[in-house]
C-alpha cells in the first residue's frame, strides 16, 4: 500500500463575505401587555358562554325526551295501512267493534268482493284503522286515498275495502259511504 494524499476536499475561503439579511426584524410583533384581570375576565366570559350552550342543549333534550301525548306535535305516527305487514298488530284501534266473529265476517266479506290479502291479521287491523281514521275527522275519500297510497295492490278495490270495513266495524259511519258502495 502506498501513501496516497487525502481525498477530502475543503471549501476554499472567499475574499468577500455575502451580506447578511435580517428578515426577522421586519416582521417582529411586539406583544401587548395584558393584565391578569383581563385574562381572567376573558376566561370567565368564554366559560359562561360554554355553560350557557350546554344548558340550552340539556334543556332541549329534556323537553323532547319528556313530552306528554297531550302536547301538540307529540302524537305518535300511525302505522302504515299496508296489507303486507309481517307481524300481527298488538291491539285493535279503540272506536271499533271488537269480536273474533266480526273479524271472520270481515275477512269473508273481503273474500266475497274479490279482495285477497297475505296477512289476515294485518287486513283486520287495517279495516279497524278505517274506523279510527273516520273517527279522527278524515273523510271517506281521504281514507281511500291513504289506503291506496299505502297498499297499491288493492287498486280499484280500495273503496270496496273501506266500505266493508265501515259496515263491519263501525256501522255508525254507514251514512258517509257513497251510494252503491
From Swiss-Prot:
Protein name from the UniProt record: Uncharacterized protein Rv3067
Keyword Transmembrane helix tagged: yes
Pfam families according to UniProt: DUF732
Organism, as annotated: Mycobacterium tuberculosis (strain ATCC 25618 / H37Rv)
Subcellular location: Cell membrane
Annotated GO CC locations: plasma membrane
Top-level taxon: Bacteria
InterPro entries named among the record's database cross-references: DUF732
Bias kind Low complexity: ranges: 7-19
Region Disordered, residue ranges: 1-21, 70-99
Alphabetic keyword roster: Cell membrane, Membrane, Transmembrane, Transmembrane helix
Topology of the protein relative to the lipid bilayer: Single-pass membrane protein
Entry's transmembrane regions: 44-64
